[in-house]
Regions:
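Catalytic micro-motifs at enzyme active sites that drive phosphoryl/nucleotidyl and oxygen chemistry
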Residues: 1-5, 50-58, 178
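Structural motif
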Residues: 2-11, 95
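Catalytic cores of large soluble enzymes that bind and process phosphate-bearing ligands
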Residues: 4, 8, 41, 75, ...
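Aromatic-acidic/polar surface patches that form glycan- and anion
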Residues: 5-9, 16, 155, 159
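Phosphate/oxyanion-binding active-site loops and adjacent basic polyanion-contact surfaces
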Residues: 13, 42-45, 158, 162
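Short, hydrophobic alpha-helix immediately C-terminal to the catalytic nucleophile
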Residues: 13-18, 163, 167
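Active-site-proximal segment of RNA-dependent polymerases
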Residues: 17-79
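Conserved polymerase palm-domain catalytic core
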Residues: 59-186, 190-200
Length: 201
């Protein structure tokens, strides 16, 4: 779901994202991660997919497989502490950036007062669905329990987190597993391979 923010908050987040986070994050991304980066985008991802397809065909012919996938409820299940920790590593845990990110992530927290103590104790690691959450009666959302997970799709910081949060997976697939024909756009990805077993692995 998309949640709006105040104009002053939006200005702060634009500056933080455009001038601070994106230049640092971009250095860590594979070229075939196409979302939310100037000069890339959905058209760039389509072009890269076509390039991969052509190169694959020249190397392997028409034998092989393409595995398409996405991260289940990706934005709903981004854990704030992990995302913030990854971002702060880019800035040697700078105190001011830490403070600013903490304020923003706090605004993303989800009221889960309706949960039992058992549900609350495991909610960070259970799959959260914001669409189902919207069906919870408002009178059960009392502000007593908050979950530090989930980000707002419409927020610019969420877009930065979306491209960066799984970057270790990108690097693992691309470089450790040597999958040249791999690309990702936010939570959607693909791998082309002549080996079905390798893709299943």
């Amino acid at each position: 779901s998309i949640t709006s923010i105040t104009p002053s908050d939006r200005i702060v987040r634009h500056v933080l994202c455009d001038e601070v986070l994106i230049p640092a994050v971009e250095k860590k991304l594979i070229y075939d991660n196409s979302a939310s980066i100037k000069g890339r985008g959905i058209s760039h991802q389509r072009e890269r997919f076509e390039v991969h397809l052509q190169k694959y065909y020249r190397k392997y012919g028409n034998e092989g497989y393409i595995l398409f996938g996405d991260f289940t409820k990706f934005y709903d299940n981004i854990i704030h502490e992990l995302a913030k920790k990854e971002l702060l590593r880019l800035f040697d845990n700078d105190e001011f950036i830490d403070w600013l990110l903490t304020l923003i992530f706090d605004s993303f927290k989800v009221d889960v007062s309706y949960m039992s103590d058992d549900e609350y104790s495991s909610c960070l690691y259970d799959t959260f669905n914001k669409l189902d959450y919207r069906k919870i009666p408002k009178n059960l959302l009392t502000g007593e329990k908050w979950m530090a997970k989930s980000v707002n799709i419409g927020d610019q910081l969420s877009q930065v987190i979306g491209i960066y949060y799984p970057y270790r997976i990108d690097n693992y697939v691309k470089y450790v597993r040597s999958q040249k024909f791999y690309g990702r756009y936010m939570d959607d990805w693909y791998i082309m391979s002549p080996s079905k077993e390798e893709l299943e692995d």
